[in-house]
Each structure stands twice: as C-alpha cells, then as structure tokens.
C-alpha cells in the first residue's frame, strides 16, 4: 500500500471518503503552513511532502500528524516517525521534504471530494 492509499483506507474505516492520490488530497481542507515548533498542527491533520520545482510544489507523499512532532505514514509498511531530531524514530529524509499540512476533518461533507459514505452518490447508488 502507498501513502495516499493508507490515508484513504484509515479514513474510510471511519466512514470518510477522501480523494485517491496525495496530490489530490493536498488540495482538500484548510491548508496550514507548518510552524517551526509544529504548535499549529492537530492530531489528524495531513502532512504533505515533496519538492519545489519551477516555483511549484510537487506533492509526492502524505502522512497523518499524530501530535508531539510524530506522524504515521506508509511506503509499503506503516511506520511511525518523528520530526524531532532527538527522537529515536527521527525521519530526516521526510523532515527535509516537508511542504505543508491540511486540516480535512472539519470539512467532511462541507467540501467537494470530502464525504461520508451516506453523502457520496456512488455509495448511495451501489450499497443501499
């Protein structure tokens, strides 16, 4: 399973539907520029990683923020990592390519592409 599939699966287990790819997930909810101390993030926020090319952000990875500078993500295996350089699970690679975060949970059923199954036309048509 890849990162965006992991995010999608976890949310679907809680009856929430989110777009399929990390780049699509990155344009949902409220964008958050991450504070140096991570104080403006909340557990459940999505953190996006990638690179800036030609002045444009290229999202290539997504994770759930857990709090206390930790995040959980998947690249084949689910892994709990940290942005804190003093932590044993510090992830220097992903810390170096962190772009921004997004708060999506308050926007479920309020924004196109973020639904619960009972509000999604596909699920209504095929599973009732």
Give residue ranges: language-model regions.
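Aromatic- and glycine-rich peptidoglycan recognition patches
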Residues: 34-35, 59-128
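Generic structural signal for buried aliphatic residues
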Residues: 44-47
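Catalytic cysteine-centered active-site loop
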Residues: 1-42
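Acidic helix/loop microenvironments that form the catalytic cleft of cell-wall polysaccharide enzymes
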Residues: 1-5, 49, 65
